[in-house]
């Protein structure tokens, strides 16, 4: 997770990857990995203000009509304060339903390059222990990551899919590129309720990558035409 003293992946990605490796060797887990994971977690600073947003939400604000589009618009506009308020309203109105995680994941995938790997691992980490009291922590995790860079506009879907990833994979130069490709492939094969939206954004990203690499106007792999 550290490359030249600079983190190249989110802690959720790192710990989920370690969990996956250890899951294959439960009878004799690697002491090196266990030690690394323990030291890594110990070096992280816990977020301390996650609950404050919920505590500060006025009760009359929860009773108002709740529209998912208000949360989506706030995220799109990059208004951090409004995003927190709308997310809290949706979360409280839905009684802590994890559905909000998929809503935010679809938005984050408008930037597959920056968020694809993180979103896959974040959803998987929650699914490993899908407890209601953990939903808000994961909501904050996604919101804080999305805040790092502006979201592009929602994209139009294309006919591209995992079968068109070959040329992109062959051009990978950094480990983060492999993480992204593996993540979007797994997301494509998932069964999330917002999967159509996930596929729309992923197909657009694949199309753009292949346009750059093979010059086809529609972004398709000529071997699959």
Model-based region annotation:
Residues 1-225:
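Mature, well-folded catalytic/scaffold domains that follow N-terminal targeting or propeptide regions
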């Amino acid at each position: 997770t550290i490359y030249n003293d600079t983190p190249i992946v989110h802690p959720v990605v790192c710990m989920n990857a370690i969990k996956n490796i250890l899951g294959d060797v439960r009878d004799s887990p690697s002491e090196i990995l266990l030690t690394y994971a323990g030291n890594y977690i110990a070096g992280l600073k816990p977020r301390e203000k996650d609950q404050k947003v919920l505590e500060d939400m006025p009760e009359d604000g929860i009773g108002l009509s709740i529209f998912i589009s208000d949360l989506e618009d706030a995220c799109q506009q990059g208004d951090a304060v409004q995003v927190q308020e709308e997310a809290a309203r949706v979360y409280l109105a839905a009684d802590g339903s994890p559905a909000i995680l998929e809503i935010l994941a679809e938005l984050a995938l408008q930037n597959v390059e920056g968020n694809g790997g993180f979103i896959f691992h974040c959803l998987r980490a929650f699914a490993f222990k899908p407890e209601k009291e953990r939903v808000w922590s994961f909501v904050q995790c996604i919101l804080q990551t999305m805040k790092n860079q502006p979201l592009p506009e929602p994209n139009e879907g294309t006919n591209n899919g995992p079968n068109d990833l070959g040329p992109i994979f062959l051009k990978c130069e950094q480990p983060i590129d492999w993480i992204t490709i593996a993540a979007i492939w797994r997301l494509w094969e998932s069964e999330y309720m917002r999967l159509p939206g996930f596929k729309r954004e992923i197909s657009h990203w694949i199309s753009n990558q292949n346009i750059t690499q093979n010059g086809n106007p529609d972004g398709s792999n000529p071997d699959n035409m």
